[in-house]
From Swiss-Prot:
Chain's gene name: panB
Catalytic activity entry: 3-methyl-2-oxobutanoate + (6R)-5,10-methylene-5,6,7,8-tetrahydrofolate + H2O = 2-dehydropantoate + (6S)-5,6,7,8-tetrahydrofolate
Source organism per UniProt: Brucella canis (strain ATCC 23365 / NCTC 10854 / RM-666)
NCBIfam families, A to Z: panB, PRK00311.1
Official protein name in the record: 3-methyl-2-oxobutanoate hydroxymethyltransferase
Active site: 187 (proton acceptor)
Length: 275
């Protein structure tokens, strides 16, 4: 019998080297069971602060805490052995100073064992990104639409149509690449600009609502699986529709319990002989 094939966990360096070679497959993961299911199929799993909305029912990501991200990062690491695992830095955990960013990012790395952190921001965060990278913390950048800054841009909308807006996003991506990030998310950005940035910078671009022009794609798993139903962004394709199945299963369970058909004899522990 042949020995099972053991695959090493992908590293940020491997992800970076995928630019122009093979599209990077990425999804979000927040729990151990789901991470186990996604791990064999993904190059990168993101423990996203989107968990605040899809798991906890928050209206935005702004109330997500560092402790929450660490707890879910630990859960995802327990369920993975192949994908590169990156943990989002939540709002307020890195913007104050590069020293604050390092202190909190180091805690995330130490307490979860993840492969790197993701933070939002462009030119204004480049110094922080460089500071972290020089101290051994791989950084996944995030430009374009940045959910942690949604209140300053007037809500969730696509960006990059005007020259000024496009120029800002272009400069942001260049700054993050030059600062040493191993890859960068481009979110909610028009296709021509995403294509231009992908050709312009030497690190992979991972798109979410930025077209197939990017070097890879990421989606929120609960969107992709049809579990999160509060709203559906235009860029989401539902590859499954699990919400109705969950509801139907709960309905069937409730019906059997009320009719005393569950548990049946096959689900009951019998008394020991002679008891």
């Amino acid at each position: 019998m042949s020995a099972p094939v053991t695959r090493k966990r992908l590293t940020p360096k491997v992800i970076q080297a995928m630019k122009g070679e093979c599209p990077i497959v990425s999804l979000t993961a927040y729990t151990t069971p789901v991470a186990r299911l996604l791990d064999p199929h993904c190059d990168l799993l993101l423990v996203g602060d989107s968990l605040g909305m899809v798991l906890y029912g928050m209206e935005s990501t702004l109330a997500v805490t560092l402790d929450m991200m660490i707890m879910h990062g630990q859960a995802v690491m327990r369920g993975t052995s192949h994908a590169c695992v990156i943990v989002d830095m939540p709002f307020g955990s890195y913007q104050e100073s590069k020293e604050q960013a390092f202190r909190n990012a180091a805690r995330v790395m130490q307490e979860t064992g993840c492969d790197g952190v993701k933070l939002e921001g462009g030119e204004e965060m480049a110094e922080t990104v460089a500071f972290l990278v020089r101290r051994g913390i791989p950084v996944f950048g995030h430009v374009g639409l940045m959910p942690q800054q949604v209140n300053t841009v007037g809500g969730f909308r696509s960006l990059g149509r005007g020259d000024d807006e496009a120029g800002k996003i272009r400069r942001d991506a260049q700054a993050i690449a030059q600062a040493g990030a191993f890859a960068v998310v481009i979110e909610g950005t028009v296709e021509p600009l995403a294509r231009e940035i992908t050709a312009l910078i030497d690190i992979p671009t991972v798109g979410i609502g930025a077209s197939s022009a990017c070097d890879g794609q990421v989606l929120v798993s609960d969107d992709m699986l049809g579990l999160f139903q509060d709203f559906t962004p235009r860029f989401v394709k539902r590859f499954a529709h699990l919400a109705p199945q969950v509801s139907q299963a709960a309905e069937a369970y409730a019906e059997e319990v009320r009719a005393r058909r569950f548990p049946g004899p096959e689900h009951v522990f019998g008394a020991k002989p002679g008891a």
